[in-house]
Amino acid sequence: MATVGGNRALYAVVALPLLATLLHGPMRLSHAFPYRSLLQTCQPSGSIQGRSGNCNTENGSECCKNGRRYTTYGCSPPVTGSTRAVLTLNSFAEGGDGGGAAACTGKFYDDSKKVVALSTGWYNGGSRCRKHIMIHAGNGNSVSALVVDECDSTVGCDKDHNFEPPCRNNIVDGSPAVWDALGLNKDDGQAQITWSDE
């Protein structure tokens, strides 16, 4: 039968190394818990007040409502070899629901082109401009698409953004050609996907 003194000795053996690890700061803690980055999340950076306007609802776009508050983000979830995202539908054509010309090129793109816009954090100040990403759908289909624009998570509800709210922080906004190549139903408006840099 264990004694009280024996129990105290056992607690000391277990607790002291843990306490030493915690007291030696973040560097030691990262060795004790190497998956700490998985706990980091992208938090909202603020909000904007909605303003309605001439919103093109061609692809089921959500239009801003006067006075409503919309969350903004300056970040996106961490990029991995298979980053989870929500694919939304967007026309990059002139007069389409995409608003202004593509940020990367200053051009519009016909709906037959496989192009995408990425949420602000993934767009990363334009570092992915004119680069291809590989998109994988749950049905097993994949497509390579060119990054041409930012799906802005920091602003919205204005003419440049088709009077739509700021993008969520986990969006890959794909052209109709991307949806067709993936064999997805455009009437759904959004789909769960994964993507990776090529």
Curated annotation (Swiss-Prot):
Q: Which InterPro entries match?
A: Kiwellin-like, RlpA-like_sf
Q: Which cysteines are joined by disulfide bonds?
A: C42-C75, C55-C63, C64-C157, C104-C129, C151-C167
Q: Check the record and name the SUPFAM superfamilies matching this protein.
A: Barwin-like endoglucanases
Example GO biological process? defense response to fungus
Show which residues constitute the signal peptide: 1-32
Q: Which residues are glycosylated?
A: N59
Query: Membrane spanning segments where?
Result: none
Chief location: secreted
Q: Classify the source by domain of life.
A: Eukaryota
Q: Name one Pfam family in it.
A: KWL1
Alphabetized GO MF terms: enzyme inhibitor activity
What compartments host this protein?
Secreted, Extracellular space, Apoplast
> Which Gene Ontology cellular component terms are annotated?
apoplast
The family database entries (PANTHER family) matched by this protein are listed as:
RIPENING-RELATED PROTEIN 2-RELATED, RIPENING-RELATED PROTEIN 3
Query: In UniProt terms, what function does this protein have?
Result: Specifically blocks the catalytic activity of the chorismate mutase Cmu1 from the fungal pathogen Ustilago maydis. Hinders substrate access to the active site of Cmu1 through intimate interactions. A structural feature specific to the fungal secreted Cmu1 called extensive loop region (ELR) is required for the intimate interaction. Does not interact with its own chorismate mutases. The secreted fungal Cmu1 presumably affects biosynthesis of the plant immune signal salicylic acid by channelling chorismate into the phenylpropanoid pathway.
Subunit notes for this chain? Monomer. Interacts with Cmu1 of the fungal pathogen Ustilago maydis. A structural feature specific to the fungal secreted Cmu1 called extensive loop region (ELR) is required for the intimate interaction. Does not interact with its own chorismate mutases.
According to UniProt, the name of this protein is Kiwellin-1
Which source organism does the UniProt entry give? Zea mays
